């Protein structure tokens, strides 16, 4: 999709400034603003919206109600289970200087994230993607969390199903350009 990316949040700041807060009172990223002034925040909501609006072929939003529910289930799992587990890992290993790291919190986060990823590993033993035989919007946010787990976590257990799936989604140019090809910072 044609878009303009504005770097906001983290080292770029701006999320606490009045213009941004008017769009997203949470002061978090991402925020989608369309040319007509429509504003939407929350990552998974934005993914679902863009798929519904632009994916006329139905390649991202499963047409089958049950497959669509499974895709949404994994999106919500990413948000409610993986996100809280991986946050101390990401912040601890990527954003915190070595001398200031809380290794106990990082270790606990790695254990929780690993347990969650083992659920994904089991799911991917059956279909090739989280919601079935085809890539869907459910794979996008889960893939983002996998990227955050695979790269900084030392000595993670073997997860061949997840590795196969991650290789498949990473081979997709949009995923590579937006996620996999960008260093964690």
Predicted regions and their residues:
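GST-like domain detector, emphasizing the conserved glutathione-binding G-site
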Residues: 1-107, 111
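Active-site-flanking alpha-helical
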Residues: 51, 145-146, 179
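Residue-level recognition of oxygen-bearing side chains
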Residues: 45, 161, 174
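Phosphate-coordinating loops and pocket residues in cytosolic domains that bind phosphorylated ligands
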Residues: 22, 62, 171, 180-181
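GST-like fold's C-terminal all-alpha helical module
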Residues: 63-66, 74-171
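Short, solvent-exposed turn/loop segments enriched in Gly/Ser/Thr/Pro and often Arg
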Residues: 9, 137, 182
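Terminal-tail/helix-coil boundary detector
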Residues: 175-185
